[in-house]
């Protein structure tokens, strides 16, 4: 009986976690399309010279923390989004970027 209850709870927690992750990716896509697409392209291909192609380069092999720092603080020609995006928005954008892998 305890094994059945444990299994049911495990399955329910997994479903909840997947729904939360999907929501974060969806919200991240909305922010990306609004704030990032002009330079990085709709599919993350990098529309301007020197910008990373998220589907081919090493950028997405960085840690979430490193990517969050880049979005928050800026890097090279990329401006800082500190104060323009919430911490949650930035985490959601990183979750969306991970969907390119």
Predicted regions span which residues?
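Post-cleavage N-terminal segment of exported redox proteins
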Residues: 1-24, 70, 97-101
């Amino acid at each position: 009986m305890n094994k059945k209850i444990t299994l049911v709870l495990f399955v329910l927690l997994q479903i909840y976690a997947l729904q939360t992750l999907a929501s974060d990716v969806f919200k991240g896509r909305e922010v990306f399309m609004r704030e990032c697409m002009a330079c990085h392209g709709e599919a993350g291909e990098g529309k301007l010279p020197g910008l990373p192609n998220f589907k081919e380069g090493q950028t997405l092999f960085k840690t979430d923390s490193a990517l969050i720092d880049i979005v928050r603080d800026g890097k090279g020609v990329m401006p800082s989004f500190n104060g323009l995006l919430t911490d949650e928005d930035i985490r959601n954008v990183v979750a969306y970027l991970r969907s390119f892998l």
